[in-house]
Amino acid sequence: MSEKLKVGILGGTGMVGQRFISLLENHPWFEVTTIAASPRSAGKTYAEAVGDRWKMTTPMPEAVKNIVVMNVNEVEKVASEVDFVFSAVDMTKEEIKKIEEDYAKTETPVVSNNSAHRWTPDVPMVVPEINPEHMKVIDFQKKRLGTTRGFVAVKPNCSIQSYAPVLTAWKEFEPYEVVATTYQAISGAGKTFKDWPEMEGNIIPYIGGEEEKSEKEPLRIWGEIKDGVIEPANSPVITCQCIRVPVLNGHTAAVFVKLRKQPTKEQLIEKLVTFKGVPQELGLPSAPKQFIQYLEEDNRPQISLDVDYENGMGVSVGRIREDSVYDWKFVGLSHNTVRGAAGGAVLCAELLKAQGYIEKK
């Protein structure tokens, strides 16, 4: 591969922005050349702007320390420096929708970690192993925006990554009712225990907006493009409870499923461990070699042992067993800020590059 694509990170000083910067260090295709954040950070070096708020466990990459942070609101100026941007801005939903489209209108592709555009009908919301074909809706979005190369693409909520891939792998058995309870890490709120000491030894049985996202977003991912928009699927019915637990990284889900066709346990496991998608076929740089692993031990998956499976880009499943109320039950685990956030967005960008939607300006 020749010259790397120049990448900007919008909202680069926050937790997800930091995760983007960590993940993109030494990336074979992409190089972070521009970081944009709020006006109060603009004009400082990245190291000064972040100060003692670096939340990653690995050190800040040397290559970004002296990048001078730009004002994220100076759209034309930031856009002129990059081939595409990742968005992790912290604003209101309406502000995010506007600023992401403003960047797209400068002919700069936007790959967003935010939820603002997830239900914009012509914006693809993609898990690359599940619905890569949804990227085709970008052609309709460009007509609406009046662009030739600018668009917005998004990744779904972190909570669904522990069970949506499993249900996709079991599609031929026709899941029709799903009950899920998610146990979600504090990094999902952009926090560490240092920022949120009251979470130590505590559980909060509510995460604002999370249950609706967890119930509805999988249906959009399983939907189809019709008349230039994505029409969500109407089955299975999913009901969720989302609980904040005292864990730094990793979302666990306890899931019950009703299936129209009854497989054996061995068939269910076989479908998981052989499940592959376009990222695996293309060998994309961030793609896990095996997307879903099944663990036979009764006490797995565990955060401390399994959250970093496939560099945080894989899903770990365990405890598949028959159920007396539903048909089957299982426990899933995924890394909420890697696969569930920045890593998932990086994989989307790799897919978009492979599909020809992202290229050098």
Where would I find each of the regions flagged by the language model?
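N-terminal Rossmann-like NAD(P) cofactor-binding subdomain of oxidoreductases
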Residues: S2-P205, V237, Y309, S316, ...
